[in-house]
Regions:
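N-terminal entry segment of metal-dependent catalytic domains or homologous docking segments
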Residues: 1-38, 43, 49-53, 137-140
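Extended hydrophobic-aromatic, low-complexity segments
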Residues: 43-44, 102, 112-114, 120-123, ...
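Active-site-proximal, acidic helix/loop segment immediately C-terminal to a metal-coordinating Asp/Glu
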Residues: 39-61, 148-176
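PP2C/PPM family metal-dependent serine/threonine protein phosphatase catalytic domain
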Residues: 1-18, 73-79, 109-141
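Short intrinsically disordered, low-complexity coil segments enriched in acidic
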Residues: 1-5, 173-178
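Catalytic core of PPM/PP2C metal-dependent serine/threonine phosphatase domains
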Residues: 1, 45-116
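Short hydrophobic-aromatic micro-motifs
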Residues: 30-33, 103, 150-153
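Acidic loop->beta-strand submotif enriched in PP2C/PPM serine/threonine phosphatases
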Residues: 13-26, 87-89, 122-163
């Protein structure tokens, strides 16, 4: 499995409110996650980085994704609603042995699966971390096949391509083999 990441701060800011995690587990699974802090700048960066670091610690400790999200949400809320802003979480856990991807979304932007010239969109209407005491997320399982591309993005990218059929653009992209 090949992975790649690109990010950029808003405007001239050296801070980006998005942070990410890619973790390969011994059991043949790979976890990819994007946390997006509300707003932009240093505060959004710090808050999303905290969520990603907590997720990484939970994964390293052997927590499953449900327990990890419950723990992270509880810790985030314990910080106090006046001291933190909500953070979106987009997480995909891919079992490289079976090809099953479990996509978990909490207020996150769409995820795209590109297969040949078609694009499947996974959307969610859930709330971000830190809004409700009980974790609000949607989980969708998808079968991936050799040659598929999973494209996870934050709302910052999608917001900067207004009035365009994003699925159509992604279907036209040709991704070269390494």
């Amino acid at each position: 499995m090949l992975t790649g990441v690109a990010r950029r701060g808003k405007g001239c800011s050296k801070f980006n409110g998005d942070n990410f995690l890619i973790s390969r587990l011994d059991c043949g699974k790979t976890t990819a996650a994007i946390a997006d802090g509300m707003g932009s700048g240093k505060r959004a960066f710090i808050e999303s980085r905290m969520v990603i670091e907590l997720m990484e610690n939970c994964i390293d400790a052997g927590f499953d994704e449900h327990a990890a999200l419950d723990l992270i949400n509880a810790a985030y809320i314990a910080g106090g609603s006046k001291s933190v802003n909500p953070v979106t979480m987009d997480m995909s856990v891919i079992d490289c042995n079976t090809g099953i991807m479990s996509c978990i979304k909490m207020g996150a932007a769409a995820t795209f699966i590109k297969r040949d010239s078609s694009v499947e969109v996974i959307k969610s209407t859930t709330l971000p971390l830190g809004v409700l005491e009980k974790v609000d997320y949607e989980r969708v399982n998808k079968k991936l096949y050799n040659g598929d591309y999973v494209i996870m993005v934050s709302d910052g990218l999608l917001d900067n391509i207004p009035n365009v059929d994003k699925e159509k653009i992604l279907s036209l992209i040709h991704i070269s083999e390494p």
